[in-house]
Amino acid sequence: MTHAAIDQALADAYRRFTDANPASQRQFEAQARYMPGANSRSVLFYAPFPLTIARGEGAALWDADGHRYADFIAEYTAGVYGHSAPEIRDAVIEAMQGGINLTGHNLLEGRLARLICERFPQIEQLRFTNSGTEANLMALTAALHFTGRRKIVVFSGGYHGGVLGFGARPSPTTVPFDFLVLPYNDAQTARAQIERHGPEIAVVLVEPMQGASGCIPGQPDFLQALRESATQVGALLVFDEVMTSRLAPHGLANKLGIRSDLTTLGKYIGGGMSFGAFGGRADVMALFDPRTGPLAHSGTFNNNVMTMAAGYAGLTKLFTPEAAGALAERGEALRARLNALCANEGVAMQFTGIGSLMNAHFVQGDVRSSEDLAAVDGRLRQLLFFHLLNEDIYSSPRGFVVLSLPLTDADIDRYVAAIGSFIGGHGALLPRAN
């Protein structure tokens, strides 16, 4: 494997992509006149230019040039229902017919709140927001006020929204709270540092599985250590389940048997509409009770009828607890097939994750934190992405794989075959297993 060979392979991939997608390129160039980088969502950009997606149906997408793809990214986990599910579309239309901007409590929000609290037992009460980012910000605000402390424990590689990122390089857009950043999946260090800073710590915020860093599962002993340490020092524990709530019938934390003080939700729970929620212990959430509590929480679209209707329809008619369990089992089976394929081909490539979420990594051995991926050549992930596009599979440049309900067995077989052809076609460029 040489750097020059990988560069050449990537240049060839760029050229084929550009030749095949003139309409997307024109759209990108026209849009860039009015939007910086033609973009309002950074994760969607990739060189030489991103595809313009024209429409979706079921588990299929069509781009501006008419190419059809099997969708294996599913709106970065928000699209668990696929595209244009009739049950959700009908619910949204019915809600709109009753009026969109009602400027008041409405008939739909209470039933969705009850459904979520019943689905996720650790949530006694909740409030709606417009995104997972907002949900995490409000959960942190609640913890700071409830404890009267200022320090927030987070973990390297963590991502809790557009203004709460803790990757390898500090993000200038991260809000300026007093953060203590600790290594992920290191129970010993977490216990020691939380005990050391205990009187200052208001809250410990963690993903039970880190999503943006590459589907890195939190080890049960690590998550349990956070629960015990937070309790010991009088801090709150917040599980960010914006992504992971879909990984088990009642959320990943419930499956692990670890109860947080607050939980944040987002993505798919709004039925594909803008959605977020935070909730948990009733005594903490009472801070936001406008009759007695000291904290205000506003947002014009927090309880918008389209999200309230779509969310309820999705959770009752499509992504039931039984459906969540079945989708997780499909994901486990797929990941096992992919890892067996990589092992049989002798390449240092693996898929980490839980259930219906997984990520490709060009590395051998256990992946317990983002530090274990620091030496991975990012160009290989790009090669994989463009290879999958050539195989009519839409995925993520970072190797993220997301299953949705409408994906068929044939779609999944095609994905496995595409990974096999990628290894076969680029094997000389890939690291070999020891």
Swiss-Prot record:
Is inhibited by 2-aminooxyacetate (AOA), a mimic of beta-alanine and a known inhibitor of aminotransferases. The modification N6-(pyridoxal phosphate)lysine is found at residue 267. Pfam families: Aminotran_3 (PF00202). Its cofactor is pyridoxal 5'-phosphate. It catalyses: (S)-3-amino-3-phenylpropanoate + 2-oxoglutarate = 3-oxo-3-phenylpropanoate + L-glutamate; (S)-3-amino-3-phenylpropanoate + pyruvate = 3-oxo-3-phenylpropanoate + L-alanine. Its EC number is 2.6.1.-. InterPro entries: Aminotrans_3, PyrdxlP-dep_Trfase, PyrdxlP-dep_Trfase_major, PyrdxlP-dep_Trfase_small. Pyridoxal 5'-phosphate binds at residues 132-133, 300. Is an attractive template for future beta-aminotransferase-engineering efforts toward the synthesis of enantiomerically pure beta-amino acids. Transmembrane segments: none annotated. Has high activity over a broad pH range (4 to 11.2). GO terms for molecular function: pyridoxal phosphate binding; transaminase activity. Keywords: Aminotransferase, Pyridoxal phosphate, Transferase. (S)-3-amino-3-phenylpropanoate binds at residue 41. Gene3D superfamilies: Aspartate Aminotransferase, domain 1 (3.90.1150.10), Type I PLP-dependent aspartate aminotransferase-like (Major domain) (3.40.640.10). Optimum temperature is 55 degrees Celsius. Displays a 2-fold higher activity at 55 degrees Celsius than at 30 degrees Celsius. Binds 1 pyridoxal phosphate per subunit. Belongs to the class-III pyridoxal-phosphate-dependent aminotransferase family. Aminotransferase that acts exclusively on beta-amino acids and exhibits a broad substrate range in vitro, accepting meta-, para- and, to a lesser extent, ortho-substituted beta-phenylalanine derivatives as amino donors, and 2-oxoglutarate or pyruvate as amino acceptors. Is highly enantioselective toward (S)-beta-phenylalanine (is not active with (R)-beta-phenylalanine) and derivatives with different substituents on the phenyl ring, allowing the kinetic resolution of various racemic beta-amino acids to yield (R)-beta-amino acids with >95% enantiomeric excess (ee). Homodimer. This is Beta-phenylalanine transaminase. It comes from Variovorax paradoxus. The lineage of its organism: Bacteria, Pseudomonadati, Pseudomonadota, Betaproteobacteria, Burkholderiales.
